[in-house]
Every structure is written in structure tokens, then in C-alpha cells.
């Protein structure tokens, strides 16, 4: 089940939970999406500022598996 988080502070609290398994970072032209997988929900945070996204990426917990997903060209 997906859930959206609006605040960066709430996202960091969620990422530090013990049931958080991994974080996927999806980069677009206009925004960056951080998706943290917990046991029940997939929490998503959308950031439009690239500098804030880099700061958030560096402040993620070190024990968490971080995976960066690049945009693929599905329609050619």
C-alpha cells in the first residue's frame, strides 16, 4: 500500500524505523522521488529542489539499502 509523506523530517523518521528495508531514489527532470519500503507501506516523498534531494540522500541512515533508479526510455 502506498503512502505519501509531505515533510522531510517525517520521511527521515520513517527511514530510521526498524522495519524500513530499503530506499529507492527515482530522478526525473523536474523532481526526485524517495521511496522507503517498510513492512506494511511504501512511503514516498517528492522533492522538487535538487540541492535538498542531495542533502537528504546524504542524511539517510547508513544501514539502509539505497538503490538509485534511472529513467528508462520506454517509448522509442
Swiss-Prot record:
Gene3D superfamilies: 3.30.720.90. InterPro entries: Ribosomal_eL38, Ribosomal_eL38_sf. Keywords: Ribonucleoprotein, Ribosomal protein. Pfam families: Ribosomal_L38e. One of its GO terms (cellular component) is cytosolic large ribosomal subunit. GO terms for molecular function: structural constituent of ribosome. GO terms for biological process: protein-RNA complex assembly; translation. Belongs to the eukaryotic ribosomal protein eL38 family. This is Large ribosomal subunit protein eL38. The gene is RpL38.
